[in-house]
Amino acid sequence: WYKNGEKEKEGNLKDGKEDGLWVVWHENGQKAVEANYKDGKEDGLEVNWYKNGQKESEGNWKDGKVHGVLTAWYENGQKQAQANFKDGNRDGLQVMWYVDGEKRLETNISEGKPHGDSVTWFANGKIRSEEYYRFGIIRAAKYWDNKGEPADSLEEAEGGFNLDQTINRKGLIYLKDSDSPYTGKLFEFHANSLKKKETKE
């Protein structure tokens, strides 16, 4: 329980490990997480909510790893990202949107690497890049600036934007802009949602 009397979390333990449905609440009483566990590992559907009650993310887990479609939303309810995972690794179509709903990125991933067509857009809706990859190696590309004029290189398109998506130790997925990580995170997933919410409050 929180100091203000609100319930913090609730769930079952089996042999000292989380088992079955666990629920975590924000300190303001809003539900924060619903996650299913098996032998202490997430297994099944996990849903996260913002403090305002808006859904933050939803995805399936298998034996402690995200598996299947993972979807994230902005706090205003607009869809932020949708990605396909296989045994904890990105695999398949990955899509991102700006907060106003304009599409930002659409790319395909195979075995953790870009494979096939990859397209990005500026916030004004104009296309920013069209690239074709084969297992992480870029084979063809076209770039434009935010006015729709052709750009000779990705760096010319307002300071550069590459599709190096990385997952750091904390499980945060970032798009990198030049040499520094992009300031807005795509979405996050955690090996233990209960610990995540405990540290956030």
Tell me the role of every PLM-derived stretch:
Residues 1-201:
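Glycine/tyrosine- and acidic-biased, solvent-exposed loop/turn segments at the edges of beta-strands
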